[in-house]
Amino acid sequence: MSEKHKKIEELRSQRWFAPDTIRAFAHRQRLQQIGLRREEFMGKPVIAILNTWSEMSPCHSHLRDRAEAVKRGVWAAGGFPVELPVQSVGEVMVKPTTMLYRNLLAMEAEELLRSLPIDGAVLLGGCDKSTPGLLMGALSMDLPVIYCPAGPMSNGQWRGVKTGAGTHTKKYWDERRLGLIDTVAWEELEGAMTRSIGTCNTVGTASTMTSIADAMGFTLPGASSIPAADGAHPRMASQCGSAIVDLVWRDRRPSTWLTDKHVANGVAVYMAMGGSTNAAIHLIAIARRAGIDLTLDQLAAAAAKIPVLLNLFPSGTALMEDYHFAGGLRALMRKIEPHLHLECEGATGQSWDSLLADAPCYDDDIIRSLDNPVVSLEQGATLALLRGNLCPDGAVMKSSAAEPRLRRHSGPALVFDDHETLSRMIDDPALEVTADTVLILRNAGPVGAPGMPEWGNLPIPKRLLEAGVRDLLRISDSRMSGTHYGSCVLHVAPEAAVGGPLALVRTGDIIDLDVAAGTLNMRVSDDELARRRAGHVPQHKTYGRSFAALYQQHVTQANEGCDFDFLQAGEAVPEPPIH
């Protein structure tokens, strides 16, 4: 353990426990009420374990056990652990989308850490929105923290084929729609694709965000790829518990070490992974909580320099477990050293130049080099930024996952005002659609849905699937699962619900996309758009009460991170008075 910099009386929790007052008496009394001895908590760093465990969140179903491992580490290092449940925001089960609740998790995390006698925290999460939500809240409170990622699930296997969560779900669902997979095989696939605890085993949003957190310095170095079911995972969790006690004594709050260079390291890893487009939104939100300005232009500039190096689904052919045993994050970062700020020290105080010096790569096909990428910059990028009269504030596309023929495309729009209409009509044999048609879904953004669900990978109409078409140009103000693929333009800003031009496009308008030029336009004159705007009537549902109402009133647009306008970096909130 490093030399202590703080004295016991400087611990934040001492305000609750140390004074000879009636209020501090009550605090000490209540801990003894549950069977704790004074010597177990007095004069020790109080470590919160923010746990997103839930029986409705399969990705986090093991985090109750991991919390016990963290506690072992905290006790061993001389701290006092307390487990605090927070909402799980696990994908799949939560409707309409977990994105609706990311900011709520951030608020919950921040206020728990502020309102209780906490000196530092271990953040237990992993599924998509849990990582940014926990980090955003922790950054706003600014206590020493370590992120303990849930870890990816084991490789999927089905009839001799390696299968990845999300990626193959989409592929096989299209085959089932065509009658190529019967019910017996379909039900068999349910139990074969997701075989263990943990997050998606592809480069989805979960693995993208935990890897970014790792590269930025919030985890124990290299922790992000450890499989959830591996014995190394609880050992890592215990180490997190020991490490956070050390960080408290050293006062390693994020504000003392996190800089724009740390964010840039996270961005570089994001691009090299071929990561989820969702990370663009989350990274902007995380950076802004730390008072660091990050824009879509900066993300796109990094994507234009760093090709996709990970040979993992959906861009490649392997899975996260393979990546871990090929060397994991340290091996990947060593391959992109020219694009990193190696002097950056993370929460633990270790710099990347020392951590990468001896980082081995055991499989150069899974973790490629800059001169032998999985997807070259000429073939596509992790993130392409588009602007034009359809998206003046920007839209994004994962061009590395799109068909080459559609990266420069013109075609007539087929517009759907809501997801229900889309679902009802998409397989109608009479639907007027060709391989050149541009499918558009609107009112599916942050305000319009609300919560910006992952509806952006619009299904291919059945009549086109039957004709052999497997990709179409699709545009929406919603998001897409990081496990998916296809020519999908996402995060159109401003969204339709706040009056963005997407609200004005009509079926039959010609849409022009040029990924290389970074443009997305509709062939409609300014005068005609003005006429349409004058007669426009908003189509989205509005909420008068509940969290959805708060969300619609205060959420920012995709290019701004979809945070609440009152939660971004600003004046520090004072410590709570104790009376």
Swiss-Prot record:
Induction: Is highly up-regulated during growth on sulfoquinovose, compared to growth on glucose or succinate (at protein level). One of its GO terms (molecular function) is hydro-lyase activity. Its EC number is 4.2.1.162. InterPro entries: Dihydro-acid_dehy_C, DiOHA_6PGluconate_deHydtase_CS, ILV_EDD_C, ILV_EDD_N, IlvD/EDD_N, Sugar_Degrad_Dehydratases. PROSITE patterns: ILVD_EDD_1. Gene3D superfamilies: IlvD/EDD C-terminal domain-like. The keyword ATP-binding does not apply. Its cofactor is [4Fe-4S] cluster. Pfam families: ILV_EDD_C (PF24877), ILVD_EDD_N (PF00920). Keywords: Iron, Iron-sulfur, Lyase, Metal-binding. It catalyses: 6-deoxy-6-sulfo-D-gluconate = 2-dehydro-3,6-dideoxy-6-sulfo-D-gluconate + H2O. It is an enzyme of class 4 (lyase). [4Fe-4S] cluster binds at residues 59, 127, 200. Homodimer. Catalyzes the dehydration of 6-deoxy-6-sulfo-D-gluconate to 2-dehydro-3,6-dideoxy-6-sulfo-D-gluconate. Is involved in a degradation pathway of sulfoquinovose (SQ) that allows P.putida SQ1 to use SQ as the sole carbon and energy source for growth. Belongs to the IlvD/Edd family. This is 6-deoxy-6-sulfo-D-gluconate dehydratase. It comes from Pseudomonas putida (Arthrobacter siderocapsulatus).
